[in-house]
Regions:
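Acyl-donor binding region in acyl/amide transferases
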Residues: 80-137
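Short amphipathic alpha-helix that is part of the acyltransferase structural core
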Residues: 1-50
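Conserved donor-binding loop and adjoining core beta-sheet/short helix segment
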Residues: 59-94, 156
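N-terminal prepro-regions of secreted/extracellular proteins
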Residues: 55-56
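Short, charged/polar, Gly/Pro-enriched secondary-structure boundary elements
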Residues: 158-161
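Conserved catalytic-core motifs of GNAT/GCN5-like acyltransferases
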Residues: 135-153
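Short secondary-structure transition/capping segments
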Residues: 128-130, 150-156
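Short glycine-rich, low-complexity/disordered patches
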Residues: 34-43, 115-121, 142-144
């Protein structure tokens, strides 16, 4: 795939395979590319290629819960107290990403997660997460963004025992 041909694809029109989702996610994640730039230079690869390899490696961890919604892949590392740490890999358009995130939040709730936490490095992603959380009709769903640590937390509903 040529660099100029890499772009988000509407899942309503075409479902990407997971490899293509990682290609698009690595290409679109400029903040992630910046974070891996030094390591990529030492390894003599582009930051985009380094980020792609890291995404594949992280997604392959058998201990993680994996969920797909549209052209977005999610992983959840489960912790005590029904808490999960989330990574998302998006290859979808923004309107679909919001819907995919909403489906993901609903699915995570159904499989037992009360709180989800993610590290966020763009204000746009905070807006997308808040929009997805608003789509959940449960008044117990709450969001919180800690800008000092770039952590976003969302409760998926009322706490369960």
């Amino acid at each position: 795939m040529k660099l100029e041909g890499i772009h988000p694809v509407s899942s309503k029109e075409h479902m990407l395979n997971p490899t293509d989702i990682f290609v698009v996610a690595a290409h679109e994640d400029k903040g992630g590319q910046k974070m891996v730039e030094k390591a990529a230079n030492k390894s003599h690869v582009t930051p985009e290629r380094m980020l792609y390899s890291m995404m594949i490696h992280l997604y392959s961890d058998k201990k993680l819960v994996r969920i797909r919604a549209g052209n977005t892949l999610f992983t959840i590392a489960a912790f005590e107290g029904r808490v999960g740490y989330v990574h998302s890999y998006n290859g979808d358009t923004v309107p679909n990403y919001i819907e995919n995130m909403h489906q993901f939040l609903e699915s995570a709730r159904k499989i037992g997660f009360d709180t989800l936490v993610a590290r966020i490095h763009t204000p746009e992603l905070v807006r997308i997460l808040k929009a997805a959380a608003r789509k959940m009709k449960d008044p117990a769903v709450k969001t919180h963004f800690d800008s000092e640590h770039n952590l976003f937390a969302v409760s998926t509903g009322k706490k369960r025992d």
